[in-house]
Amino acid sequence: MGENTVPQKSSDNVGSIVALMVALLVAIFAFQLNASMLSPALVTMQAQLHTTASSIALTQTIFFTAAALFALFLPRLADLIGRKKVLIGMLTLTMIGCLISGFATNVGILMIGRILQGAAGPVVPLCLIILHVKVRDEKRYAKLMAILTSINGGIAGVDALAGGWLVSHGGFRSVFFVMGITAALAILLVSFGTQESTAKDTPKMDWTGVILLVVAMGALLSAVNALQGSFGNLGLPNWLLASILALLGLICFVGFWQVEKRVNHPMVPIHYLKQRRTWGLLITTLLTMTGVFAIMNGIIPALGQDGKFGLGLGADMVSLVTLTPYALAGLFFGPVSGFLAARFGFAKVLRVGLLTTIIGIVLAVAGVLQPSIWLLLLVSTFIGITYAGITNIMLNGLGIVLSPEDNPGYLPGLNAGMFNLGAGLSFIILYAVPTVLHTSVGGSSSGYISGIVTGLILVIIAFFTSFLIPDSKDCKINLE
């Protein structure tokens, strides 16, 4: 018997697994819609709320920051008080946030709503933990886990198109109401389709450690956002504000480390932080996300729209050529990578994903040298398979299967934080390097190339750090 308790009536029959998968899929949909469905509504929100583009952009920043911070501790809290209970609570807060945002009359109320919507941040790792408790066979789990995580990445692009249709027919509020309805449906399905489980040992939550870790990560994420100019209206230079926030984050992390060494039941035992299963995975996730995210969500779309050095496509056409095939390729290949992980192991498939992603990024450089719509489509589809369909799924899966028996929630939470931190760092680093070289992304072909090559170098480093990640069998993982 392992370190998780499951209901006495728990069974692995097909009907219960199908009900569980449907419930978890809709819960993940509810999070994904909050993350990406709003993109086409931003300009309309600015007009209808009589505010500025920077204020609306800040509401997006606040949502993603809140999502990252909730992900740090809610999976561990779920270990202690019940995963089903916490998932329903997260979805309830998300639904309330959607309603507040939908009825918002000014940007201040909208920000409150978006913060509450950020409670959905750890939905994916928590759903993967719930699935792992139910499905004890590692090979079967790998296949089902891949379906959940590929769906999470796969509707990006499609949901944005749906968001655009809703905005044009019902205004931005209709988008929030659809998000709220989806969250309500998820609450209903999770209530009836999942069973409660906790860790075997359920001491009190280490709230001192939680506060210090949340402030530390929040300060670091805010420092990244400050470098991007998200808080420019505070009157301080971006570099100075970022430095202050980074120092605050460092101080709080040192405090977190000291607290965790002294309390009887730490949120994250220090000996786990020192193990390769923790820092090996977190470093690889951070490097990978930093290397890939801005390429696929910034540089490649910008190249498609660039009339001088690229193809001069419209925004809608660029989405159809780059973002949508990238997402759909990940969706369709995800189950295949799950099958491969079940046969060869998560770590080996991760390395294949990273190696082929490196090849895809090299193709992206060719796309700059000889721009064509077919080459951009090929690059987007290829990296959609190798990153969204393989690498991203394996990184999420490793966060679950490498988690220790007595603390299965800490690693998925920290891993989610690295995904979010990497997304922010990606736009800073990949756009800063061309500036150092006296060019810019969009300013010349060499600007695009230097940004992409920077990402390429980071992913190459991630490939080598992936060899630091131990095999799950070496960690004696057993979540039964």
UniProtKB/Swiss-Prot annotation:
Recorded GO molecular functions are: transmembrane transporter activity
Q: Which domain of life is it from?
A: Bacteria
PROSITE patterns named in the record: MFS
Location(s), subcellular: Cell membrane
What are the TM regions of this chain, as residue ranges?
A: 14-34, 55-75, 93-113, 115-135, 147-167, 174-194, 207-227, 239-259, 280-300, 320-340, 358-378, 382-402, 417-437, 449-469
Indicate yes or no for the key word Cytoplasm: no
Keywords from UniProt, A to Z, are: Cell membrane, Membrane, Transmembrane, Transmembrane helix, Transport
State the membrane topology: Multi-pass membrane protein
Mainly resides where? Answer: membrane
Q: What happens when the gene is disrupted?
A: Mutant shows slower uptake of uridine. The double mutant uriP-nupA is impaired in uridine transport.
Per the record's keyword annotation, is Protein transport included, yes or no?
no
Gene Ontology cellular-component terms for this entry are: plasma membrane
* Function, in words: Responsible for the uptake of uridine and deoxyuridine. Not involved in purine nucleoside uptake.
What family is this?
Answer: Belongs to the major facilitator superfamily. EmrB family.
Task: State the name under which the record lists this protein.
Answer: Uridine/deoxyuridine transporter
